[in-house]
Amino acid sequence: MAASRSLVPDRLRLPLCFLGVFVCYFYYGILQEKITRGKYGEGPKQETFTFALTLVFIQCVINAMFAKILIQFFDTARVDRTRTWLYAACSVSYVGAMVSSNSALQFVNYPTQVLGKSCKPIPVMLLGVTLLKKKYPLAKYLCVLLIVAGVALFMYKPKKVVGIEEHTVGFGELLLLLSLTLDGLTGVSQDHMRAHYQTGSNHMMLNINLWSTVLLGAGILFTGELWEFLSFAERYPTIIYNILLFGLTSALGQSFIFMTVVYFGPLTCSIITTTRKFFTILASVILFANPISSMQWVGTVLVFLGLGLDAKFGKGTKKTSH
């Protein structure tokens, strides 16, 4: 880390982290919606992008390459002693979460997806209580209750709201729930690696993405999705440019998140990422005409209020066993 310290003056590090996370994931969100919910072609022969496995495969390849570069230049002294099977097991939930999240966009609009993915404290807390036997402070439960109330308001539709896109009821939300659960399992696995093997963030990023690349590579070959995607890309070559940018912004964003956690801690990182998600929803409403009702705005504010309070007051935990 000494090399990276000398590159950025202390007074500029926080603004750099904030802008890095905000810009990378803001553009990442725009690209994700453009790729997965855009219409390709003209007239009655319009097509949609349905290649979630291939999209995540390319994203994991770029993440792995980026992590390898970071290790080569900034983290050569660290020796990684983490068990290989742990990386392999973690990659299963990691891949499942990303594929489910991207697939959900075929059934729900982007604000719903972002809000759903913002509810990560819920499965993390449930898995912490059930698997790791953690005890959380009352503030944590109240914050999660606020998030649940916000999601309930956002999802509740007493009548059809004009301008809000209809989708297959329930399936997109189930995919988001699956993604959240798998995110929670990934978090538990990563905590275990850090606690028992002191795994560095760059090595974790490299190895989990390498294993994910193997799993997804087998998946896109076995299902034949790779050939369908190549045919789609031949008809609409701009998709390649968008996907490469999507993967690059994801990798850069991850590196800025790790930098924020290392230098300023998880609280600052939570505040930055929560702020970014709110403005991503706002941008989606403005840029992609995803109107949401006043009740849904109230639900959105409650969710982000709960996330902000959780970042500030809900972090204390006591482990009763491991």
UniProtKB/Swiss-Prot annotation:
Key words, A-Z: Antiport, Endoplasmic reticulum, Membrane, Transmembrane, Transmembrane helix, Transport
Catalyzed reactions per annotation: ADP(in) + ATP(out) = ADP(out) + ATP(in); UDP(out) + ATP(in) = UDP(in) + ATP(out); UTP(out) + ATP(in) = UTP(in) + ATP(out); dATP(out) + ATP(in) = dATP(in) + ATP(out)
Record keyword Membrane present: yes
Cellular localization per UniProt: Endoplasmic reticulum membrane
GO BP terms, alphabetized: UDP-galactose transmembrane transport
GO molecular-function term, one example from the UniProt record: ATP:ADP antiporter activity
Membrane topology: Multi-pass membrane protein
Cellular component aspect of the GO annotation: endoplasmic reticulum membrane; Golgi membrane
InterPro entries assigned: SCL35B1-4/HUT1 (IPR013657)
Keyword Signal: no
Membrane-crossing residue ranges in chain numbering: 12-32, 51-71, 85-105, 136-156, 168-188, 210-230, 243-263, 285-305
Motif Di-lysine motif, residue range(s) on this chain: 318-322
Similarity comment: family membership: Belongs to the nucleotide-sugar transporter family. SLC35B subfamily.
Recorded domain comment: The di-lysine motif confers endoplasmic reticulum localization for type I membrane proteins.
Database matches in PANTHER family: SOLUTE CARRIER FAMILY 35 MEMBER B (PTHR10778), SOLUTE CARRIER FAMILY 35 MEMBER B1 (PTHR10778:SF10)
Its biological purpose: ATP:ADP antiporter that catalyzes the exchange of ATP and ADP across the endoplasmic reticulum (ER) membrane. Imports ATP from the cytosol to the ER lumen and exports ADP in the opposite direction. Regulates ER energy metabolism and protein biogenesis. Appears to be part of a calcium-dependent ER to cytosol low energy response axis, where calcium efflux from ER to the cytosol triggers ATP import into the ER lumen to maintain sufficient ATP supply. Provides ATP to ER chaperone HSPA5 that drives protein folding and trafficking in the ER.
The protein's name in its UniProt record: Solute carrier family 35 member B1
The species this protein was found in: Rattus norvegicus
High-level lineage: Eukaryota, Metazoa, Chordata, Craniata, Vertebrata
Gene: Slc35b1
